[in-house]
């Protein structure tokens, strides 16, 4: 399987997949461990941190504000010397968030309450097109001052640190990024802050903030109401990052689709706010077993074993979307090989990811001959037709690149994928792992 950075990668169709694989550390948890470690007192050590572009962007921003963070390398424990809750310095340079929406959105919350300090955040051309008002607007209820293009919606963004005051904030969407930005800002506010979500989003921030010593309560129906009381000192911790279920999803779907396949994905985070993918695979009739369930540093973890079998069409919508939003691209590939018509709805959020993922997946799968209709909030896919090898393009999106790799395995005839290196944003060793499992 050829393809170096910038050159098209050949995807050979056919063959099977067998073996064990360990996916990189969870991206969401990696970002949060870096951010909370930076504003804690004392040393934080992180085991299993994802050594990919997005967390590296978060670390670079924190270093620019005076935080000492050891190099981020595969297999190495990362050490952070915390500067305390109000110890971040005004940087002398613009903070570059790269391609990482999580970095930019969480930084807005982290920096909003740094009174008297000024910060400018930017990112690559894709990130500069992504909406930031969904964070800036709720933060303004606490007194934050965020300015930028399109009335503060588009980067570059300027944050003028303010004295914040606690508030009751209802978030417009069930987004862990929005919620986490408000929680970070609330740590430096005067008075308590309550965050109320329309639906329960991933809860890594709440779990980890409590482990670091924040005064935080979770209540309401399904944990949709979070209360933060400022004033508690965060203390450095040892954080163990489990494997990212969003990266495991590619192997789970591939194992279910590819004839003769049996794959075990080891050490996967099974936080219940992230396991929507397992429910949809179950709905499809996929053969998946959870082995060796355990708890690691406050997060449920297990090994997932998947094997090939016949799959039936599925439907899901907004009720489950916060728990599998990143898995929609690979599930759209799965739908092409299910018996019947599958429908994904409530997924309008995907139009403002690294790319418009609904449009990109529809475009790329149609190039392979898929029977697929695009809707404002989702996709309808009629399965049971063969896909044909084609010239494909990730359109710079990491999840699209890896989803198309799985489609390419199942196609009749070989494919080529342009910009396959995008996978490195969340899974730097994806193509190597694919080669190994094919042997």
From Swiss-Prot:
The active site is at 326 (proton acceptor). PROSITE patterns: EPSP_SYNTHASE_1, EPSP_SYNTHASE_2. It catalyses: 3-phosphoshikimate + phosphoenolpyruvate = 5-O-(1-carboxyvinyl)-3-phosphoshikimate + phosphate. GO terms for biological process: amino acid biosynthetic process; aromatic amino acid family biosynthetic process; chorismate biosynthetic process. Keywords: Amino-acid biosynthesis, Aromatic amino acid biosynthesis, Cytoplasm, Transferase. One of its GO terms (molecular function) is 3-phosphoshikimate 1-carboxyvinyltransferase activity. It is found in: Cytoplasm. One of its GO terms (cellular component) is cytoplasm. Phosphoenolpyruvate binds at residues 27, 101, 130, 177, 357, 399. It comes from the Bacteria. Pfam families: EPSP_synthase (PF00275). Transmembrane segments: none annotated. Its EC number is 2.5.1.19. 3-phosphoshikimate binds at residues 27-28, 32, 175, 177, 326, 353. Pathway: Metabolic intermediate biosynthesis; chorismate biosynthesis; chorismate from D-erythrose 4-phosphate and phosphoenolpyruvate: step 6/7. Gene3D superfamilies: Enolpyruvate transferase domain. Monomer. HAMAP family: EPSP_synth (MF_00210). Catalyzes the transfer of the enolpyruvyl moiety of phosphoenolpyruvate (PEP) to the 5-hydroxyl of shikimate-3-phosphate (S3P) to produce enolpyruvyl shikimate-3-phosphate and inorganic phosphate. Belongs to the EPSP synthase family. This is 3-phosphoshikimate 1-carboxyvinyltransferase. It comes from Synechococcus sp. (strain CC9311).
């Amino acid at each position: 399987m050829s393809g170096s950075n910038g050159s098209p990668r050949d995807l050979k169709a056919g063959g099977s997949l067998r073996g064990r694989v360990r996916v990189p550390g969870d991206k969401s948890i990696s970002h949060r461990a870096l951010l909370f470690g930076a504003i804690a007192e004392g040393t934080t050590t992180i085991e299993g941190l994802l050594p990919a572009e997005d967390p590296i962007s978060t670390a670079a921003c924190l270093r620019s504000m005076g935080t000492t963070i050891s190099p981020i390398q595969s297999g190495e424990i990362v050490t952070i010397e915390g500067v305390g809750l109000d110890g971040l310095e005004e940087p002398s340079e613009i903070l570059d968030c790269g391609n990482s929406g999580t970095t930019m959105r969480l930084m807005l919350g982290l920096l909003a309450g740094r009174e008297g300090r000024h910060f400018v955040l930017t990112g690559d051309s894709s990130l500069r097109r992504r909406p930031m008002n969904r964070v800036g607007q709720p933060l303004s209820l606490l007194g934050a001052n965020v300015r930028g293009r399109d009335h503060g919606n588009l980067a570059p963004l300027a944050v003028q640190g303010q004295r914040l005051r606690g508030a009751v904030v209802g978030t417009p969407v069930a987004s862990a990024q929005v919620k986490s930005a408000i929680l970070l800002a609330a740590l430096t506010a005067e008075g308590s802050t309550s965050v109320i979500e329309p639906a329960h989003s991933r809860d890594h921030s709440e779990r980890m903030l409590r482990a670091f010593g924040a005064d935080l309560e979770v209540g309401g129906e399904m944990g949709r109401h979070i209360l933060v009381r400022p004033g508690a000192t965060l203390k450095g911790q040892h954080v163990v990052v489990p494997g990212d279920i969003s990266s495991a999803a590619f192997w789970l779907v591939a194992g279910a689709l590819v004839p003769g396949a049996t794959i075990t994905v080891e050490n996967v985070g099974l936080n219940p706010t992230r396991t929507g993918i397992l429910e949809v695979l179950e709905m499809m009739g996929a053969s998946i077993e959870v082995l060796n369930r355990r708890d690691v540093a406050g997060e449920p973890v297990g090994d997932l074993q998947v094997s090939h079998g016949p799959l039936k069409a599925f439907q899901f919508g907004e009720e489950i979307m916060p728990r599998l939003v990143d898995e929609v691209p690979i599930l759209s590939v799965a739908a092409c090989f299910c018996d019947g018509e599958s429908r994904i709805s409530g997924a309008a959020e995907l139009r403002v990811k690294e790319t418009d993922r609904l449009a990109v997946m529809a475009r790329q799968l149609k190039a392979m001959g898929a029977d697929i209709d695009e809707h404002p909030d989702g996709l309808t896919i009629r399965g049971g037709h063969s896909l044909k090898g084609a010239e494909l393009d990730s359109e710079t999106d990491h999840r699209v690149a890896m989803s198309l790799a799985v489609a390419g395995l199942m196609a009749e005839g070989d494919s080529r994928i342009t910009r396959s290196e995008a996978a490195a944003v969340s899974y730097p060793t994806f193509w190597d792992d694919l080669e190994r499992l094919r042997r």
